[in-house]
A protein has these predicted regions:
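Short loop/turn segments at strand-loop or loop-helix junctions that form parts
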Residues: 71-72, 124
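Conserved N-terminal substructure of TIR/SEFIR domains
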Residues: 1-71, 90-100, 105-107, 137-154
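Conserved TIR/SEFIR loop-to-helix hotspot centered on a Trp-containing motif
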Residues: 74-96
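Short catalytic/ligand-binding loop motif for oxyanion handling, primarily in non-cytosolic enzymes
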Residues: 21-23, 77-79, 110-114
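Short amphipathic alpha-helical segments
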Residues: 25-28, 81-84, 116
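Conserved GTP-binding G-domain of TRAFAC-class P-loop NTPases and closely related GTPase folds
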Residues: 121-145
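Short, charged/polar micro-motifs that form catalytic or ligand-binding hotspots
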Residues: 17, 48, 76-80, 132
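Glycine-rich, charge-decorated loop segments at or immediately adjacent to ligand/cofactor-binding or catalytic sites
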Residues: 109-124
């Protein structure tokens, strides 16, 4: 039985570098309980149907999202599209309180001076996922943090 029967699931948008796709998939697996409980529905650009205009699809989804996850790595920071388009729009929506932006530190990189550097990051202590001895523990910590953010939105 869904824990959220009367509420619509909150749209979660993944902003990430395609070089981090495997880590995005691992995170998605750890969010399965939140999806089954109808607390969230997730979206990323690999879900764009053939023939759709990808920039419009991304713009629409980032503007609909209640939670925007920035999956941080050196590749994310090096991506002009992630940095200049997705992250910029995400932070605009965050500042207007239209969405919650959560940085997820996937791999070690110099992110602290970035525009999102003032936001509380996950996992615990902003320790990069790939540095945890057990990645499942890192992704569980992230999933719990996302659940708490979702509960605050309801």
């Amino acid at each position: 039985m869904p824990l959220n029967p009367s509420e619509q699931p909150i749209q979660v948008f993944f902003s990430y570098s395609h070089k981090d796709e495997a880590l995005r998939d691992e995170l998605s697996t750890h969010l399965a309980v939140l999806k089954r409980q109808r607390l969230i529905r997730e979206w990323h650009d690999r879900q764009i149907p053939a023939g759709d205009v990808w920039k419009e699809a991304i713009d629409d989804r980032i503007n609909e999202a209640g939670v925007i996850l920035l999956l941080i790595s050196a590749d994310f920071l090096a991506s002009d599209y992630c940095h200049e388009i997705e992250m910029k729009r995400a932070l605009e929506r965050h500042e207007k309180r239209e969405a919650v932006v959560i940085p997820i530190i996937l791999r070690p990189c110099n992110w602290q001076g970035s525009p999102f550097g003032k936001l509380q990051a996950l996992p615990k202590d902003a320790r990069p996922v790939t540095t945890w001895p057990n990645r499942d523990e890192a992704f569980t910590n992230i999933s719990e943090g996302i659940r708490r953010a979702i509960e605050r939105l309801q």
